[in-house]
Amino acid sequence: MKHLFMATLTLLLAVGTAQADPLFGVWKSAADDNGKFGHIEMQDCDGKICGTLIKSFAPSGKEASSPNVGKLIVWGMKPRGDGKYAGGKLWSPDRDKTYKSKLRLTGDNLQVSGCILIICRDGDTCTRVK
């Protein structure tokens, strides 16, 4: 009986810690300077949150090939509570720049901001695909 109790307790603790973060899923990025956008899959990467470009689209909305599909776009993000995430980096393929980044999740919208030194880029919004 004691073993059954311990096994049940262990299972319940494992389920509680394995719950998915609300940020996990697929997000449609804001259009870049050329009008292209992508789908980014946000997931757990060794206890932090990362995002990989899984599809790329032309300005027309038609799926397009891209050498960046499969590459990390977001990495090292940590939840800060109240829908806020920070401590990570974001790579902007159209500018080939990496920014210190912050995210704010509100429903199915994700506000993205990032800075290089004192220059900040703010206001891009991603929308949840699934």
Ranges and model annotations:
Residues L23-F24, K28-K100, T127:
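Central antiparallel beta-sheet cores of small beta-barrel/beta-sandwich binding domains
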Residues D94-R95, K100-G123:
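Short, exposed beta-strand-loop hairpins at the edges of beta-sheets
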Residues K2-T8:
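Sec-dependent signal peptide recognition
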Residues A7, P22, F57, T106-G107:
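General secondary-structure edge motif
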